[in-house]
Amino acid sequence: MHVAILLAIISLARAAPSTKGYTVATSLPGKSAFETRRLPDAPEILKNWAGRLDIPGTTIGNSLFFWLFSAEDKAYDDNLIIWLNGGPGCSSLVGAFLENGPLRFMGNSTMPERNPYSWAKLGHVLYIDQPVGTGFASEKVPVTSNKEVISNLYSWLMSFDAIFDHILRTKKVHIVGESYAGIYIPYIASEIVKRKSELPVNLVSIAIGDGTIGPNTGMSSLGMVGFLEEYASKLRIPRDIMNAISFGDHACGFDIIRQRAKVYPPRGPFHLPGRSGSANNTEISNMLQKGVADESLGSCNIHPDTPEKIRSSIVNSTCYGHCAVFETTADYMSSQQCFSIYNINYGCNFTNPTSTLEAYFSRSDVQIALNLMHPTDPLRPFQSCNPKILETLMAPANRPVPPSFEILPDLLTTHKLPVHIYQGRLDMLINHVGIEVTIQNMTWNGAQGFQDSLHFEFGRQKDKAVGLWNEERGLSYHLFFEGGHFLPADLPMEVLSYVKEVVLRQ
């Protein structure tokens, strides 16, 4: 059960006595306690801080891990970017060392190298492992709901701010993340703006990449056929199979919704029929977590390979649930060699660096450098993603209200907080068609959706536009043509420019 937060952080960070089993309030360590040693087998970087920090008001043993990197350029000293990975249950070190941090594993390298496209070039960057049990975040009692996740994170931020010279108040704070952080970011932003009297965070904007901002159906099945029609030849889908998928799509009414979403301005809200993936959520969650590997499909590993099986799987599956266009398509595609749901351009030469990341951060000398253990302590292996957290938070009973329904419109309309959505066109897991329909179904600042279509080009690479964009009434949307689910990894230079010019407005 969630424990109410009783702690009020003051500048001296003094505390009341603890109640048995709970850290109702604690004396906070000094900032110097988190200074890191130089990472083994890695280039030297500017001053940084890392470690675990207890969550006030929760069970003793529940803490979040953080890593704060200094700004590399004094011209951007006023900026603080907070990065959250998704999953749910995936470590922020995935983002830090595989995407946008000062050090990154490049290609087949087993040791981190300097990242020329580090976001620390644009300000201080704070990476947080959350919720408890994620990455290096410790867990005594696991979280069971998004409400608990957000409450813990907000309470933790209060402690972090007290230790680090009120950095959340004095810097321009931008919260950025990807995938399931599309849930985390709007909810924590909402908590921040509504509780400014408790912690006056100088929150300037939020940005979400390939994020789960809408209902599950809208994020996956609703846009799948629209996505497949763009890339049918690249994906080598036979005509009869494509027709069968389109049959299921039409039977569920998704094609009609997509057509309505193409009308600018929209003529009214869309009803999202069906509940994709409700029958066997754990199996589907595992499938998404592991990139649709055969062994992860379990009892749902039916591999529909004929038009008849495709149609049946979409409209009558006892495993995936009704209107499972996405799950059926992903199951079919999993039989193709070297297919990746995260970026359909990844081929057989693509190397997944997750095992390298886990091996490096499972080293005792690395964990000692990060203030996570003493030389005599037992080693705790590092896990990039925790499947138990994914299963818990993705369970139908635990899913929060999609941010596009209420939270995002409130942030934009009531609190006038700039919201930036960025998306990789090659991402099949959370496809851009579904994202665009979700935006067009959202009402903010007096109107529904974008009033004009997505047609402005941005960026140039080899005489071609990097993508298309639109911005209206405080919401911007950027579609990157050649990127997938992990955009900072796929297009590091282009995304760095995007963060500088769009998110930071510099």
Swiss-Prot record:
Root EC class: hydrolase
Enzyme Commission number(s): 3.4.16.5
UniProt keyword annotations, A-Z: Carboxypeptidase, Glycoprotein, Hydrolase, Protease, Secreted, Signal
Cellular compartments annotated: Secreted
Annotated signal sequence range: 1-15
Annotated active site: 179, 427, 485
GO MF, one example: serine-type carboxypeptidase activity
Residues bearing carbohydrate: 108, 280, 316, 349, 441
Catalysed reactions, semicolon-separated: Release of a C-terminal amino acid with broad specificity
Gene Ontology terms describing biological process: proteolysis
Cellular component annotations (GO), alphabetically ordered: extracellular region
Xref: InterPro entries: AB_hydrolase_fold (IPR029058), Peptidase_S10 (IPR001563), Ser_caboxypep_ser_AS (IPR018202)
Keyword DNA-binding: no
Chain's role: Involved in degradation of small peptides.
Membership in a protein family: Belongs to the peptidase S10 family.
Protein name per the record: Carboxypeptidase Y homolog ARB_06361
